[in-house]
């Protein structure tokens, strides 16, 4: 891949992002023919990964001028920045917004790979990963595994080989590189989770989706380093509506009237689904009285041809809604009802509703539920499945972000748990003991509460608290994660399922 400096100039001018060029000869608004015809062969925002042919982006709150100085010493000649730096570079390209500039230049450098793919984007406070996986399984059937996926849990650019994601939605440079790789791998469809931070920080600036899916909205990610208010969080989430050719909306989502109004105002066609028929609902589902894993899709007009019976492996009515949203999105990009039925029936999600049996016959659930709504839905489902026993819940909360979850977890534990085991979950730079204390401070119900900071020991303790086969133990928050984020380092972690399984095997 290459791009000329003239092409870079044109991209920036088109978006009104260019301020000026700085070279040893001075400050200018234009480029000489010699300089303008020069091409760069790589893009980077890592100052340790540059050559003379790299276009380097000076971005981030933690960026320091010394990083650029060191990069220039290593041979870097061209940089993009919001401010000029006193460095002996051949060219500084000064822009009004570095994140927007990186997005549009990454698109151009990788030859607009989004235009060569069918793009499906999911947003919502909960359910994004599960709904994305349902869509992946459906489209794998429809496209013979020519579907790429970027998700919180795992990602694949060839439809088969998975790798761990660093961010829910990657930086724009990485995103377009991944899209270009997917195109080179023969992929025709591209599914991704779109976070509120992706819109707030312009990672998906100017990116439009063939289909967007808005699952739900509840307060989350509200903290000084994420979203200062719920309004800011919700506004960023709503940007998916205005950047989709068609939007799929959940009728039961909080603030649904505003979501629908946003789509109407932006003239974005909307398809509405829900758990109950209603005048505004295009597709609803009814749960089978004979089989809790079966549901019936109903529709007054059935414009997409989706009405019929579906079976899935994942329990919980909320997963039926996730499956229905995936089916609607999949049909909009070329799948058939039969392919939807086949894909939904086959879907499994790492770290979602995984279960095993404790030594005394009690069921152990491992799930990624990591905010109020997802944990409440999970615990409600488990309560319904195990009405006669105690519900033992192991949970922790992340450090340095989503601080409001600590209060939320105390609240949901008070509402639904019988026993709580508080432990470590990606504490980052914070003291996990203090995080657990904050959660416990918001538990208002009289109940046993244990704090065991070593997560492996906490899992063993939670399982040992079960006394009958009627009990249920929920290990929440980590899902299939195989690391703990501690002080900027991803420390290896065996995983909740593996640790629970090892404890059970040792006791048997």
From Swiss-Prot:
Keyword Cell cycle: yes
Residues noted as binding UDP-N-acetyl-alpha-D-muramoyl-L-alanyl-D-glutamate in the record, renumbered to the chain: 47, 168-169, 195, 203
Sequence motif L-lysine recognition motif, residues: 425-428
One Pfam family recorded for the sequence: Mur_ligase_C
Subcellular location: Cytoplasm
Statement: the UniProt record of this protein carries the keyword Cell inner membrane: no
Alphabetized SUPFAM superfamilies for the sequence: MurD-like peptide ligases, catalytic domain, MurD-like peptide ligases, peptide-binding domain, MurE/MurF N-terminal domain
NCBIfam families referenced in this protein's UniProt entry, alphabetically: murE, PRK14022.1
Family: Belongs to the MurCDEF family. MurE subfamily.
Protein name (record): UDP-N-acetylmuramoyl-L-alanyl-D-glutamate--L-lysine ligase
Species, as recorded: Enterococcus faecalis (strain ATCC 700802 / V583)
């Amino acid at each position: 891949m290459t791009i000329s400096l003239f092409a870079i100039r044109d991209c920036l001018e088109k978006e009104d992002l260019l301020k000026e060029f700085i070279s040893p000869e001075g400050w200018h608004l234009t480029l000489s023919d010699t300089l303008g015809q020069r091409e760069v062969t790589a893009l980077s925002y890592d100052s340790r990964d540059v050559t003379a042919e790299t276009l380097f982006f000076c971005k981030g709150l933690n960026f320091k001028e010394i990083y650029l100085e060191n990069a220039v010493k290593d041979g870097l000649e061209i940089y993009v920045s919001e401010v000029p730096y006193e460095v002996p570079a051949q060219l500084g390209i000064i822009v009004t917004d570095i994140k927007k500039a990186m997005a549009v230049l990454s698109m151009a450098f990788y030859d607009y790979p989004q235009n060569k793919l069918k793009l499906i984007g999911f947003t919502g406070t909960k359910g994004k990963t599960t709904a994305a996986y349902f869509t992946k399984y459906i489209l794998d059937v429809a496209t013979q595994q020519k579907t790429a996926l970027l998700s919180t849990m795992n990602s694949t650019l060839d439809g088969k080989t998975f790798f761990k994601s660093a961010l829910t939605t990657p930086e724009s440079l990485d995103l377009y590189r991944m899209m270009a790789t997917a195109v080179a791998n023969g992929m025709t469809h591209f599914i991704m989770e779109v976070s509120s931070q992706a819109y707030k920080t312009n990672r998906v600036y100017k990116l439009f989706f063939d289909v967007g899916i808005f699952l739900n909205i509840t307060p989350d990610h509200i903290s000084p380093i994420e979203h200062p208010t719920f309004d800011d969080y919700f506004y960023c989430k709503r940007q998916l509506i205005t950047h989709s050719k068609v939007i799929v909306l959940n009728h039961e989502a909080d603030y649904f009237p505003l979501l629908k109004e946003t789509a109407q105002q932006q003239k974005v066609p909307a398809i509405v689904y829900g758990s109950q028929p209603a005048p505004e609902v295009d597709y609803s589902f009814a749960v089978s009285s004979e089989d809790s894993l079966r549901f019936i899709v109903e529709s007054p007009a059935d414009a997409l041809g989706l009405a019929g019976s579906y079976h899935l492996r994942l329990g919980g009515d909320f997963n039926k809604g996730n499956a229905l949203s995936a089916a609607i999105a999949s049909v909009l990009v070329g799948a058939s009802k039969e392919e939807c039925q086949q894909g939904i029936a086959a879907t499994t999600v790492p770290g979602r509703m995984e279960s095993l049996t404790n030594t005394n016959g009690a069921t152990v659930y491992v799930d990624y539920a990591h905010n109020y709504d997802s944990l409440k839905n999970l615990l409600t489902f488990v309560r319904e499945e195990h009405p006669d026993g105690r519900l033992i819940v192991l949970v922790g909360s992340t450090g340095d972000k989503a601080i409001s979850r600590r209060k939320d977890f105390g609240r949901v534990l008070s509402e639904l748990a019988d026993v709580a085991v508080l432990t470590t979950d990606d504490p980052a730079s914070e003291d996990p003991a203090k995080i657990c204390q904050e959660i416990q401070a918001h538990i208002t119900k009289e109940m046993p509460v244990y704090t065991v900071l070593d997560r492996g020991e906490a899992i063993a303790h939670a399982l040992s608290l079960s006394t009958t086969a009627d009990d249920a133990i929920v290990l929440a928050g980590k899902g299939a994660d195989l690391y703990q984020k501690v002080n900027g380092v991803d420390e290896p972690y065996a995983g909740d399922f593996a640790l629970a399984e090892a404890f059970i095997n040792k006791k048997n």
